[in-house]
Amino acid sequence: MASGSNWLSGVNVVLVMAYGSLVFVLLFIFVKRQIMRFAMKSRRGPHVPVGHNAPKDLKEEIDIRLSRVQDIKYEPQLLADDDARLLQLETQGNQSCYNYLYRMKALDAIRTSEIPFHSEGRHPRSLMGKNFRSYLLDLRNTSTPFKGVRKALIDTLLDGYETARYGTGVFGQNEYLRYQEALSELATA
């Protein structure tokens, strides 16, 4: 009986040593990883700094140009004029499955509209996304260069734009035609 208890205690000692060394290795790996992570965060990046061993003027020019990259915004044309999906849209009788095409056409219609953005020193491409929404809100809330513009027209255009861009409901041919009509009416005002 005594030899059996010695055997169990020996197995226990080996298991405790194995588990202890496993915990030690895992802690070592974790601590090393955290130290490397914080060391990488403290520098400019995980690699050699930009412009390493370059003259000071060149480093400053590189930093200026890299900071400009964050300000670049580009929204591509969603549907080309010769897109095959537009041909399907015109030939198909069931229009409900092509709602996304009307959304894309509505967002592309801003670029091709005749709204005189240039009178305020803006360009149609600079009025994409949130800027176009804020432009419409400015038209609605302040005195505008468009003297005869009704607030209901701007509200219709704003609702159509938000539905086309962010809405989850149906945006079909009827909604697109309403939006296009409001956009052309604003352009002629």
From Swiss-Prot:
Record's keyword terms, sorted: Golgi apparatus, Membrane, Mitochondrion, Transmembrane, Transmembrane helix
GO cellular component annotations of the record: Golgi apparatus; membrane; mitochondrion
Membrane topology reported for the UniProt record: Single-pass membrane protein
Transmembrane spans: 11-31
InterPro entries given in the database record: C1orf43
Top-level taxonomic group: Eukaryota
Localization annotation: Membrane; Golgi apparatus; Mitochondrion
GO BP annotation list: phagocytosis
Keyword Magnesium: no
Function: General regulator of phagocytosis. Required to uptake Gram negative bacterium by macrophages.
Comment on protein domains: N-terminal region is required for phagocytosis of Gram negative bacterium.
PANTHER family, sorted: NICE-3 (PTHR21425), PROTEIN C1ORF43 (PTHR21425:SF2)
Annotated protein name in UniProt: Protein C1orf43 homolog
Native source species: Pongo abelii (Sumatran orangutan)
